[in-house]
Protein backbone atom coordinates (compact mmCIF):
# COMPACT_ATOMS: atom_id res chain seq x y z
CA UNK A 1 0.00 0.00 0.00
CA UNK A 2 1.26 3.50 -0.85
CA UNK A 3 2.76 5.44 2.05
CA UNK A 4 0.45 8.42 1.53
CA UNK A 5 -2.62 6.20 1.85
CA UNK A 6 -1.26 4.57 5.00
CA UNK A 7 -0.65 8.08 6.34
CA UNK A 8 -4.24 9.13 5.68
CA UNK A 9 -5.79 5.96 7.14
CA UNK A 10 -3.61 5.86 10.26
CA UNK A 11 -3.91 9.62 10.75
CA UNK A 12 -7.70 9.44 10.51
CA UNK A 13 -7.86 6.59 13.03
CA UNK A 14 -5.56 8.46 15.43
CA UNK A 15 -7.45 11.74 15.12
CA UNK A 16 -10.84 10.08 15.53
CA UNK A 17 -9.98 7.92 18.54
CA UNK A 18 -7.35 9.88 20.52
CA UNK A 19 -9.85 11.91 22.52
CA UNK A 20 -12.84 9.56 22.42
CA UNK A 21 -13.18 7.06 25.30
CA UNK A 22 -12.55 4.09 23.00
CA UNK A 23 -8.75 3.64 23.20
CA UNK A 24 -6.67 5.10 20.40
CA UNK A 25 -3.91 2.58 21.18
CA UNK A 26 -6.19 -0.39 20.56
CA UNK A 27 -7.39 1.06 17.27
CA UNK A 28 -3.87 1.95 16.12
CA UNK A 29 -2.53 -1.53 16.88
CA UNK A 30 -5.47 -3.18 15.09
CA UNK A 31 -5.27 -0.86 12.07
CA UNK A 32 -1.50 -1.20 11.82
CA UNK A 33 -1.82 -4.98 11.96
CA UNK A 34 -4.43 -5.03 9.19
CA UNK A 35 -2.31 -2.72 7.01
CA UNK A 36 0.92 -4.59 7.71
CA UNK A 37 2.36 -1.38 9.14
CA UNK A 38 3.60 -2.34 12.59
CA UNK A 39 7.40 -2.17 12.54
CA UNK A 40 9.69 0.24 14.42
CA UNK A 41 9.04 3.01 11.87
CA UNK A 42 5.31 2.63 12.53
CA UNK A 43 5.85 3.23 16.25
CA UNK A 44 7.68 6.49 15.56
CA UNK A 45 4.98 7.45 13.06
CA UNK A 46 2.32 7.00 15.73
CA UNK A 47 4.19 9.36 18.05
CA UNK A 48 4.41 12.02 15.33
CA UNK A 49 0.74 11.89 14.34
CA UNK A 50 -0.25 11.99 18.01
CA UNK A 51 1.28 15.46 18.04
CA UNK A 52 -1.18 16.36 15.28
CA UNK A 53 -4.04 15.40 17.58
CA UNK A 54 -2.54 17.47 20.40
CA UNK A 55 -2.31 20.49 18.09
CA UNK A 56 -6.06 20.18 17.50
CA UNK A 57 -6.69 20.64 21.24
CA UNK A 58 -4.38 23.66 21.30
CA UNK A 59 -6.30 25.28 18.43
CA UNK A 60 -9.75 24.58 19.92
CA UNK A 61 -8.86 25.64 23.47
CA UNK A 62 -6.27 28.32 22.67
CA UNK A 63 -8.03 31.05 24.67
CA UNK A 64 -8.27 28.79 27.69
CA UNK A 65 -4.63 27.71 27.38
CA UNK A 66 -3.47 31.33 27.13
CA UNK A 67 -5.48 32.21 30.24
CA UNK A 68 -3.71 29.45 32.18
CA UNK A 69 -0.40 31.27 31.76
CA UNK A 70 -1.90 34.65 32.62
CA UNK A 71 -2.59 35.97 29.12
CA UNK A 72 -6.23 36.95 28.78
CA UNK A 73 -9.15 35.96 30.99
CA UNK A 74 -12.15 33.83 30.00
CA UNK A 75 -14.37 34.78 32.94
CA UNK A 76 -14.63 37.56 35.53
CA UNK A 77 -15.09 35.16 38.45
CA UNK A 78 -12.99 32.24 39.73
CA UNK A 79 -11.67 30.18 36.85
CA UNK A 80 -9.54 27.20 35.97
CA UNK A 81 -5.90 28.09 36.55
CA UNK A 82 -2.45 26.60 36.06
CA UNK A 83 -2.48 25.01 39.51
CA UNK A 84 -5.51 22.91 38.51
CA UNK A 85 -3.45 21.52 35.61
CA UNK A 86 -0.32 20.92 37.69
CA UNK A 87 -2.33 19.08 40.35
CA UNK A 88 -3.97 16.93 37.68
CA UNK A 89 -0.61 16.12 36.08
CA UNK A 90 1.26 15.03 39.21
CA UNK A 91 -0.10 11.47 39.75
CA UNK A 92 0.36 10.16 36.19
CA UNK A 93 3.50 12.24 35.69
CA UNK A 94 5.25 10.72 38.70
CA UNK A 95 4.05 7.21 37.93
CA UNK A 96 5.02 7.54 34.26
CA UNK A 97 8.55 8.74 35.03
CA UNK A 98 9.18 6.05 37.65
CA UNK A 99 7.79 3.13 35.69
CA UNK A 100 8.12 4.21 32.03
CA UNK A 101 10.30 1.26 30.98
CA UNK A 102 8.29 -1.31 32.95
CA UNK A 103 5.02 -0.03 31.47
CA UNK A 104 6.44 -0.30 27.94
CA UNK A 105 7.69 -3.85 28.55
CA UNK A 106 4.72 -5.30 30.42
CA UNK A 107 1.58 -3.46 29.28
CA UNK A 108 2.26 -2.79 25.58
CA UNK A 109 0.95 -6.04 24.16
CA UNK A 110 -2.26 -7.57 22.76
CA UNK A 111 -3.22 -9.39 25.97
CA UNK A 112 -2.98 -6.38 28.30
CA UNK A 113 -4.80 -4.20 25.74
CA UNK A 114 -7.77 -6.61 25.57
CA UNK A 115 -7.98 -6.66 29.38
CA UNK A 116 -7.84 -2.87 29.61
CA UNK A 117 -10.48 -2.42 26.91
CA UNK A 118 -12.90 -4.50 28.97
CA UNK A 119 -11.85 -3.03 32.34
CA UNK A 120 -12.12 0.51 30.99
CA UNK A 121 -15.61 -0.19 29.68
CA UNK A 122 -16.69 -1.55 33.05
CA UNK A 123 -15.26 1.54 34.77
CA UNK A 124 -17.29 3.81 32.50
CA UNK A 125 -20.52 1.93 33.20
CA UNK A 126 -19.84 2.00 36.95
CA UNK A 127 -19.09 5.74 36.82
CA UNK A 128 -22.37 6.44 35.02
CA UNK A 129 -24.36 4.28 37.43
CA UNK A 130 -22.91 5.58 40.70
CA UNK A 131 -22.17 9.22 39.87
CA UNK A 132 -24.01 11.81 41.96
CA UNK A 133 -25.40 15.19 40.83
CA UNK A 134 -22.61 17.47 39.65
CA UNK A 135 -21.18 20.19 41.89
CA UNK A 136 -18.93 21.36 39.03
CA UNK A 137 -21.06 21.85 35.95
CA UNK A 138 -18.55 24.04 34.12
CA UNK A 139 -14.79 23.93 33.71
CA UNK A 140 -14.33 26.95 35.99
CA UNK A 141 -16.19 25.28 38.87
CA UNK A 142 -13.74 22.36 39.17
CA UNK A 143 -12.01 22.37 42.57
CA UNK A 144 -8.41 21.40 43.28
CA UNK A 145 -9.63 18.23 44.99
CA UNK A 146 -11.66 17.26 41.92
CA UNK A 147 -8.66 18.03 39.69
CA UNK A 148 -6.49 15.70 41.79
CA UNK A 149 -9.11 12.95 41.65
CA UNK A 150 -9.26 13.20 37.87
CA UNK A 151 -5.46 13.16 37.83
CA UNK A 152 -5.44 9.94 39.84
CA UNK A 153 -7.76 8.30 37.32
CA UNK A 154 -5.47 9.51 34.53
CA UNK A 155 -2.89 7.03 35.89
CA UNK A 156 -5.04 4.28 34.36
CA UNK A 157 -4.31 5.77 30.92
CA UNK A 158 -0.69 4.66 31.30
CA UNK A 159 -2.09 1.19 30.62
CA UNK A 160 -2.64 1.08 26.83
CA UNK A 161 -6.28 0.45 25.99
CA UNK A 162 -7.76 2.11 29.07
CA UNK A 163 -8.23 5.42 27.24
CA UNK A 164 -7.21 8.74 28.76
CA UNK A 165 -10.59 10.37 28.21
CA UNK A 166 -12.52 7.30 29.36
CA UNK A 167 -10.53 7.08 32.60
CA UNK A 168 -10.51 10.77 33.43
CA UNK A 169 -14.13 11.49 32.53
CA UNK A 170 -15.15 8.50 34.66
CA UNK A 171 -13.05 9.89 37.51
CA UNK A 172 -14.65 13.27 37.01
CA UNK A 173 -18.16 11.83 37.18
CA UNK A 174 -17.34 10.01 40.43
CA UNK A 175 -15.91 13.30 41.77
CA UNK A 176 -19.20 15.05 40.88
CA UNK A 177 -17.95 16.90 37.79
CA UNK A 178 -20.32 17.12 34.81
CA UNK A 179 -19.63 15.16 31.63
CA UNK A 180 -18.78 18.25 29.59
CA UNK A 181 -16.59 19.89 32.24
CA UNK A 182 -14.71 16.63 32.86
CA UNK A 183 -14.14 16.18 29.12
CA UNK A 184 -12.90 19.73 28.61
CA UNK A 185 -10.56 19.44 31.59
CA UNK A 186 -9.33 16.10 30.24
CA UNK A 187 -8.49 17.59 26.84
CA UNK A 188 -6.62 20.55 28.35
CA UNK A 189 -4.80 18.30 30.83
CA UNK A 190 -3.76 16.05 27.94
CA UNK A 191 -1.72 18.78 26.23
CA UNK A 192 1.28 18.92 28.61
CA UNK A 193 1.06 15.20 29.41
CA UNK A 194 1.01 14.07 25.78
CA UNK A 195 3.62 16.59 24.64
CA UNK A 196 5.98 15.35 27.36
CA UNK A 197 5.34 11.66 26.63
CA UNK A 198 5.48 12.04 22.85
CA UNK A 199 8.57 14.23 23.06
CA UNK A 200 10.37 11.65 25.18
CA UNK A 201 9.47 8.83 22.80
CA UNK A 202 10.50 10.92 19.79
CA UNK A 203 13.90 11.74 21.27
CA UNK A 204 14.54 8.08 22.03
CA UNK A 205 13.57 7.07 18.48
CA UNK A 206 15.26 9.93 16.62
CA UNK A 207 17.85 7.68 14.96
CA UNK A 208 15.09 5.72 13.19
CA UNK A 209 13.84 8.77 11.28
CA UNK A 210 14.98 9.61 7.75
CA UNK A 211 14.18 12.25 5.13
CA UNK A 212 12.33 9.64 3.08
CA UNK A 213 9.72 9.39 5.86
CA UNK A 214 8.75 13.07 5.73
CA UNK A 215 5.84 12.70 3.21
CA UNK A 216 4.33 9.81 5.21
CA UNK A 217 4.70 11.58 8.54
CA UNK A 218 3.42 14.91 7.19
CA UNK A 219 0.34 13.28 5.65
CA UNK A 220 -0.44 11.45 8.88
CA UNK A 221 0.14 14.55 11.03
CA UNK A 222 -2.15 16.78 8.96
CA UNK A 223 -4.87 14.12 8.72
CA UNK A 224 -4.76 13.47 12.47
CA UNK A 225 -5.00 17.21 13.17
CA UNK A 226 -8.04 17.78 10.94
CA UNK A 227 -9.91 14.66 12.06
CA UNK A 228 -9.15 15.33 15.74
CA UNK A 229 -10.58 18.85 15.40
CA UNK A 230 -13.85 17.44 14.07
CA UNK A 231 -13.90 14.59 16.60
CA UNK A 232 -13.39 16.81 19.66
CA UNK A 233 -16.09 19.31 18.69
CA UNK A 234 -18.55 16.52 17.82
CA UNK A 235 -17.78 14.53 20.98
CA UNK A 236 -18.40 17.49 23.29
CA UNK A 237 -21.80 18.05 21.66
CA UNK A 238 -22.65 14.34 21.77
CA UNK A 239 -21.49 13.66 25.33
CA UNK A 240 -24.23 15.67 27.02
CA UNK A 241 -26.85 13.49 25.31
CA UNK A 242 -25.50 9.94 25.05
CA UNK A 243 -23.14 9.75 28.09
CA UNK A 244 -20.37 7.12 28.32
CA UNK A 245 -22.34 3.87 28.27
CA UNK A 246 -22.53 3.41 24.46
CA UNK A 247 -18.78 3.89 24.26
CA UNK A 248 -18.33 1.23 26.95
CA UNK A 249 -20.26 -1.35 24.93
CA UNK A 250 -18.27 -0.41 21.84
CA UNK A 251 -15.10 -1.15 23.82
CA UNK A 252 -16.38 -4.65 24.61
CA UNK A 253 -16.95 -5.27 20.89
CA UNK A 254 -13.48 -3.92 20.07
CA UNK A 255 -11.95 -6.21 22.71
CA UNK A 256 -13.58 -9.22 21.04
CA UNK A 257 -12.33 -8.13 17.60
CA UNK A 258 -8.88 -7.57 19.06
CA UNK A 259 -8.88 -11.00 20.66
CA UNK A 260 -9.82 -12.87 17.48
CA UNK A 261 -7.73 -10.86 14.98
CA UNK A 262 -4.59 -9.96 16.94
CA UNK A 263 -4.05 -12.58 19.64
Curated annotation (Swiss-Prot):
Span-the-membrane segments of this chain are 15-37, 42-62, 83-103, 106-126, 142-162, 183-203, 216-236, 242-262
One of the GO BP terms on file: response to antibiotic
Catalysed reaction(s) here are: di-trans,octa-cis-undecaprenyl diphosphate + H2O = di-trans,octa-cis-undecaprenyl phosphate + phosphate + H(+)
Which Enzyme Commission numbers does its entry carry? 3.6.1.27
Q: Tell me the GO molecular function terms.
A: undecaprenyl-diphosphatase activity
Give the keywords, sorted. Answer: Antibiotic resistance, Cell membrane, Cell shape, Cell wall biogenesis/degradation, Hydrolase, Membrane, Peptidoglycan synthesis, Transmembrane, Transmembrane helix
The Gene Ontology CC terms held by the record are: plasma membrane
Pfam families in the record: BacA
Q: How does it sit in the membrane?
A: Multi-pass membrane protein
- Top class in the EC scheme: hydrolase
Q: Where in the cell is it found?
A: Cell membrane
Q: Which family does it belong to?
A: Belongs to the UppP family.
* NCBIfam families in UniProt: PRK00281.1-1, PRK00281.1-2, PRK00281.1-4, undec_PP_bacA
UniProt cross-references to HAMAP family, sorted A to Z:
Undec_diphosphatase
Q: What does this protein do?
A: Catalyzes the dephosphorylation of undecaprenyl diphosphate (UPP). Confers resistance to bacitracin.
Please share what else the UniProt entry notes about this protein: Bacitracin is thought to be involved in the inhibition of peptidoglycan synthesis by sequestering undecaprenyl diphosphate, thereby reducing the pool of lipid carrier available.
- Xref: PANTHER family: UNDECAPRENYL-DIPHOSPHATASE
Name of the molecule in the record? Undecaprenyl-diphosphatase 2
User: What species was this sequence derived from?
Assistant: Bacillus cereus (strain ATCC 10987 / NRS 248)
Q: What is the lineage of its organism?
A: Bacteria, Bacillati, Bacillota, Bacilli, Bacillales
Q: Give the encoding gene's name.
A: uppP2
Amino acid sequence: MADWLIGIIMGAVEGLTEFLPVSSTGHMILTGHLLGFDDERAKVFEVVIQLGSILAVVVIFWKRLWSLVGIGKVTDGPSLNLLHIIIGMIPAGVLGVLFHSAIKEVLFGPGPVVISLVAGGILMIVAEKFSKPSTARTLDEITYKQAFTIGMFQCLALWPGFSRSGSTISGGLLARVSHTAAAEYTFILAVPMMVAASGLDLIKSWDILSAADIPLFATGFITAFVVAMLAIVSFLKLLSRVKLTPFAYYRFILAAVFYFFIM
